């Protein structure tokens, strides 16, 4: 399943909408997403599953590039 993750790069700063970044990640659940991103110390604001028509829309209208977390 593909997830869209909204995050701030610095865990210590107050979230500001203009600084929110987005990445797409393949994982089995939201818990798995948070586990994979835990080592980066991101301030994760929201994790959203992307499927069906929403996924097709993101592929056409966004820079949908799956992040590879090692």
Swiss-Prot record:
Gene3D superfamilies: RNAP, epsilon subunit-like (3.10.20.730)
Gene Ontology CC: one annotated term: DNA-directed RNA polymerase complex
Reaction catalysis annotation: RNA(n) + a ribonucleoside 5'-triphosphate = RNA(n+1) + diphosphate
Enzyme class per UniProt: transferase
GO MF entries: DNA binding; DNA-directed RNA polymerase activity
Keywords: DNA-directed RNA polymerase, Nucleotidyltransferase, Transcription, Transferase
Documented EC number(s): 2.7.7.6
Pfam families: RpoY
GO BP: any one term: DNA-templated transcription
Protein purpose: A non-essential component of RNA polymerase (RNAP).
Family assignment from sequence similarity: Belongs to the RNA polymerase subunit epsilon family.
Subunit details: RNAP is composed of a core of 2 alpha, a beta and a beta' subunit. The core is associated with a delta subunit, and at least one of epsilon or omega. When a sigma factor is associated with the core the holoenzyme is formed, which can initiate transcription.
Protein name: DNA-directed RNA polymerase subunit epsilon
Organism: Bacillus mycoides (strain KBAB4) (Bacillus weihenstephanensis)
Classification lineage: Bacteria, Bacillati, Bacillota, Bacilli, Bacillales
Gene name tied to this protein: rpoY
């Amino acid at each position: 399943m593909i997830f869209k993750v909204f995050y701030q790069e610095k865990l210590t700063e107050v979230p500001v909408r203009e600084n929110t970044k987005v990445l797409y990640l393949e994982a089995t659940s939201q818990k798995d997403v948070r586990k994979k991103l835990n080592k980066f110390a991101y301030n994760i604001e929201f994790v959203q599953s992307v499927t069906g028509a929403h996924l097709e829309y993101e592929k056409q209208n966004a820079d949908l590039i799956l992040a590879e977390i090692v």
